[in-house]
């Protein structure tokens, strides 16, 4: 897409009061360091010094145009954002200077559309409601967001563990809290950034949890996360039709999804949270879905209520993502780690660690 009138102004390092990472123009393949001037704070907004920001596949898919040609430039991704408030808008009353808060996938929701008025602000009809669409996201040393979309970080959650709860955490927690009941047999497919959190949530929801993985070496670690059992992907076909699970949380976006659906009990629920690039679609056997009376549930991140609840749940049960941390100056290495390697299990950036002292305050 063409350039747009951005609130954040790209400038020289000398003029800048913040530093970001993203693309300045269409066609770039290597992420750039982008110095910029912060926008004027609106009455209902807060400015935070970003302490940690997560690196998520969504950021890469979106900014690289893998979900469609609707990216505006400059594009600064980032939607797992935690930091401390350094400035308050005139009408802000919910928070105070120094509070540790976070922002997730949506901002600037209209509050008026069908989705917003039916508890689905994460599906707001206004495209600009996505945190990094037509404004800078959280891959930056500083971030401006609305008071209404900020969430206080419970003191029980270390800040370096908090960022990934704002996407990976809420993405699995939101549908799980609606579909899972204590005593259910729950399968989690794909024990990566999403799956390792889904296992912990399912365990503390009072279920019997099975981690389903194609990596035998992860078995002990999966058990340590709270799983009661581990099923290797190579053994899935042997169990088709046996009715193993009330609910399956599918965290993978590629491969034969249909084989996992057929592990459900009659009337079971299949939650799909893994999203591939556009065009990489999967096929499922509609006949088996109908005959098994299965329910297929799609879910994308969560709304503000879901975010508040996942933070409280994580704080209560000490559920934290396993995170690899990188310095801000190594941001491109962190992106490469997420895109092309297999981190255990999420990657976050220490944003107050740039080589420029003025951006670390």
Annotated model-derived regions:
Residues 264-266:
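Helix-to-beta-strand junctions that scaffold the AdoMet/dcAdoMet cofactor pocket
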Residues 182, 188-191, 203-259:
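Adenosine-nucleotide cofactor-binding segment
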Residues 2-16, 204, 304-361:
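C-terminal hydrophobic helical "lid"/dimerization subdomain
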Residues 100, 185, 268-269, 295:
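Short glycine-centered segments of the SAM/dcSAM-binding site in methyltransferase folds
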Residues 37-53, 66-114, 151-157:
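Glycine-rich beta-strand-centered segment in the early N-terminal region that forms part
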Residues 195-196:
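N-terminal Rossmann-fold NAD(P) dinucleotide-binding loop
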Residues 109-189:
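NAD(P)H dinucleotide-binding glycine-rich loop of Rossmann-like/cofactor-binding domains
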Residues 275-292, 304-310:
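Rossmann-fold NAD(P)-binding glycine/threonine-rich loop
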